[in-house]
Each structure stands twice: as structure tokens, then as C-alpha cells.
């Protein structure tokens, strides 16, 4: 029976819900792989990459399912895992080390988007006025995002940047906050090529006018919060806007040389202009996450999608070796 190794973040000692979710994601995928006839083994990934290398050589897996979103809480190290897997010649799901590196550094990604003439919010210090939103350069899962992240003046943004560095460490930046709607588009490598899944909108229902309409940390992870209960996913996006979002997602897929699966996040301003916020080369595949919801909406079974990703990993590894 072919064996698949699932790599995931080592458990966070602080028990953050975004870290714990990676374990649930791995369990769901292992269950899906078992129904497809695969044996599975799961390995937590820390900074001891030599130990990981030995384990992978001992197991000699049919393929690796790479679910690592950070290494010991550091998103800046995200590309180390695909780099190791590429050096070993092991088939693995998801994007290449280069694609992960260029998309996980949000400022590098924004530079490449601008060079390709794809709209993305201006960074503080570039021409343009606020308001501004403060974000982590490397971390995902909306870490550090709350109502105080959105400010009107550069001086206020500077204070929040300093506060976030003190609280979370790492690098932070401020970009122009785009009032409006929030969309995302998931793409999966199907047997016939990249397939765009239905465009999703995250609606901020019942938000007070003075409350920033953002996907905050609470909106993603705190099930008892106002933000979580009032941020609702919908697939009823008007066809013209959805078509533009789909085309732009495919342009990002090509620009960053993405593989396997990915997600592009947008804001839509009052004039209907789409701004790319982030290109996520390793989005969450938990059954209750947006990617799985988009699969269901498109009529693709969760297990079928997991199987596609293994097949894609094997196909790409064979092409690299040829």
C-alpha cells in the first residue's frame, strides 16, 4: 500500500486556534487518503530539518502532503520545507519553494503584482492617502488583525506597527485599507489543468458603520465573537465581477508559477475595481475552511480533490526528473 507522509506545523505551546487547526486539517486529509487506499504517516515539522530529512528517507513515501504554514511560529521559514523536498526529489503537494517564497513575503508579492500591472493596495510610503491597515509581512491566518489595525493617519500607523512588533515580533507593514467588499478565489490543479473554483464573498453582516469590515483574527478563529458570527460566506457574486476575479486569479497563478492549489484574496472598491490583497500558496484545506466550501459548491468531492493533489504532485515530480 503506497504511503503518504503528511507534514504539519508542530503544535504551538500557546495553543493558538490557528495552529491547532493545522492538526485537524491533517486528520481530515489522512482520513480522505485512507479512503483512496493510501497508508498515511504524519510528521510535525520544527527547526530540526536534518531529522526530518532522515525520517523521509527512512519512510520513502509515495508523496508528501505539505501542510506546513510556519516553522515554530515563523512564517518567514515557510519555504524551507518545499526546498528540502525538492532537494530530496520527493513528490509533494502544493507550490514550489520559489512560489512559496515569493508569495509568503507580502511585500515581494506586491512588488511583483505591481510590475505585472495587477492592482494591489499601496504600501505606506508610496503615493496615496489612507486609511491604512497594519499587517504582518510573513504571517497569515489574520495574526494581529483587529479593529485597531485600521487607522487614518500615517503617524497612527507607525504607532500600531511598533505595538505589533513588540507583541508578536517579526516584520510588519501598513498598506492602504480599501473600504468595500472582500472576495476570494480558490484554484486547484485538476487532471485537465488549473481549475478555478466558485468565487466566494465574505460578507460583514450587521457591522456598525464605524467598525472596520475586515477578516480579523477573531472573525477567523474566535467562534464566540461578534466578528465570527457576523462574517458570512456567500457564493452569490454577480457574474461580471466573478468573471473578472476568476481571470485575475489565473493571471496570479501564472505570474507566481503556482502549482497544486492556491487562493487569491481581493478587496473590491466602490467603483468595482479589484485589488489583490494576498496570494496564498498554501491555503487551509480543513473541511470547514473556504477552500473546501468552494470545492463543495463546484461539485468536487473532498476526497477527489485530495486525490487530484497527490496525482499532481507525482506528475510534477516525474516532469522534474525527466
Regions found by a protein language model. Give the residues of each.
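A short beta-strand motif that forms the metal-chelation/ATP-contact edge
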Residues: 4, 65, 133, 186-189, ...
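ATP-binding N-terminal substructure of ATP-dependent carboxylate-amine bond-forming enzymes
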Residues: 1-91, 97-98, 103-104, 108, ...
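Short, basic/glycine-rich phosphate-binding loops at helix/coil junctions
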Residues: 32-35, 139-141, 220-229
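ATP-dependent carboxylate activation and anion-phosphoryl transfer catalytic cores
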Residues: 81, 236-322
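Phosphate-binding site of ATP-dependent enzymes
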Residues: 154-247, 270-275
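Hydrophobic beta-strand scaffold residues
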Residues: 40, 63, 91-92, 120, ...
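Active-site nucleotide/adenylate-binding loops and adjacent lid/helix of ATP-dependent enzymes
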Residues: 1-9, 56-58, 100-181, 190-192
